[in-house]
């Protein structure tokens, strides 16, 4: 069921997804109280005879749609002309009211065979918990409705971005990636205490940890993928890593071929900004056949390591050569442990610029450059 945007006319057309909802048309958003009482503005009255939906089932959940079905007693079932669907984010479950400020999450649809598809990126966000309740209604000749009592409240959670959605993000990121610059090392900044802890408690090997919630809210890697964060940006005038960092004054550097080579796969993970002009692209490097590789293969678009707009590894005269995109900041996640002995740790001479940290950074949902037309 496609639901009209708030600024659409009250008599909105049916969804173009006709194979799903060809018999469904949408009415004006109604104003009624959650407890089923008649509202002064709504023209809705109670009627005991209409069946109350029960045994509600939610299925086919995506980041911005779901299917809903329920059972009803046969009594007065043939009098049902409409369904009222009350959809709320879970944190608002105790204030389920038909109010102007909640529109358009209060949905009115003509009665059609179930299950019914509810779709709308302007009110459904990915990876978000919602509550839903249903009411049956019968539209009268004078335009008023008689309604059943509300059903029980059901909870569900929307899904992450699919590969299709991530491919849309990927294509938007490609537009602004810019020309490619040569680089030779990946690096990771941390505090001295971090590297001391790695040496003492992890046998000198940096261990993957769960990615934080920075970036797109719908990214399937946030809070799930385990990896180690690296950078590869270089200064334009020197071709070397910058001396400043927001993450710590000690830097681990490792030759690029140690992490990125023909025995690894490269994946696109996310594209976002933080209310600034800077845009970030998250890439994942995973050794072929590793658990991280299997995780990414199921969820992320895979990139051609030799030919893409962000990070490449090519062979020239028998030597591996590396390039990164100039106009986006790359955040590279490596999914396996990395031993400190294969690189070097040294103190940087620049500043620790905490304001540039992306730890748990929230994506700007209004940016037209890095958002797509699904839940943010």
From Swiss-Prot:
Keywords: Glycoprotein, Phosphoprotein. Glycans are attached at residues 23, 37. GO terms for cellular component: cytoplasm. This is Phytanoyl-CoA hydroxylase-interacting protein-like. It comes from the Eukaryota. Residues 52-161 form the Fibronectin type-III domain. Belongs to the PHYHIP family. Gene3D superfamilies: Immunoglobulins (2.60.40.10). It holds the Pfam family fn3. The modification Phosphoserine is found at residues 12, 15, 25. May play a role in the development of the central system. Coiled coil: none annotated.
């Amino acid at each position: 069921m496609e639901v009209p945007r708030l600024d659409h006319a009250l008599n909105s057309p049916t969804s173009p997804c006709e194979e799903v909802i060809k018999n469904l048309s949408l009415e004006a958003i109604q104003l009624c109280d959650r407890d089923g009482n008649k509202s002064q503005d709504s023209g809705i009255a109670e009627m005991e005879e209409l069946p109350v939906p029960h045994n509600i089932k939610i299925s086919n959940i995506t980041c911005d749609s779901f299917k809903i079905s329920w059972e009803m007693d046969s009594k007065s079932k043939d009098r049902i002309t409409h369904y009222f669907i009350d959809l709320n984010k879970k944190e608002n479950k105790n204030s389920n009211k038909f109010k102007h400020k909640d529109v358009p999450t209060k949905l009115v649809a003509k009665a059609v065979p179930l299950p019914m598809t509810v779709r709308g990126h302007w009110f459904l966000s990915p990876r978000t918990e919602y509550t839903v309740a249903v009411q049956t209604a019968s539209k009268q000749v004078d335009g008023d409705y008689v309604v059943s009592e509300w059903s029980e409240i059901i909870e569900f959670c929307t899904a992450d971005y699919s590969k299709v959605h991530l491919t849309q993000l990927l294509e938007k990121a490609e537009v602004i990636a810019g020309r490619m610059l040569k680089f030779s090392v990946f690096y990771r900044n941390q505090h001295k205490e971090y590297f001391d802890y790695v040496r003492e408690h992890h046998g000198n090997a940096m261990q993957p940890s769960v990615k934080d919630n920075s970036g797109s809210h719908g990214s399937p890697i946030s809070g799930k993928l385990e990896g180690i964060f690296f950078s590869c940006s270089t200064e334009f005038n020197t071709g070397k890593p910058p001396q400043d960092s927001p993450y710590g004054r000690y830097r681990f550097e490792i030759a690029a071929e140690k992490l990125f080579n023909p025995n690894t796969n490269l994946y696109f993970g996310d594209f976002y900004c933080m209310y600034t002009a800077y845009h970030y692209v998250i890439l994942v490097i995973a050794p072929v056949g590793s658990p991280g590789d299997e995780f990414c293969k199921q969820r992320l678009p895979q990139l051609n390591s030799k030919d893409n707009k962000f990070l490449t590894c090519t062979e020239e005269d028998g030597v591996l050569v590396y390039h990164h995109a100039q106009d986006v900041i790359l955040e590279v996640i490596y999914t396996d442990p990395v031993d400190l002995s294969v690189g070097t740790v040294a103190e940087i001479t620049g500043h620790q610029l905490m304001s540039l940290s992306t730890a748990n950074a929230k994506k700007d949902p209004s940016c037209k450059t890095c958002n797509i037309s699904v839940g943010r």
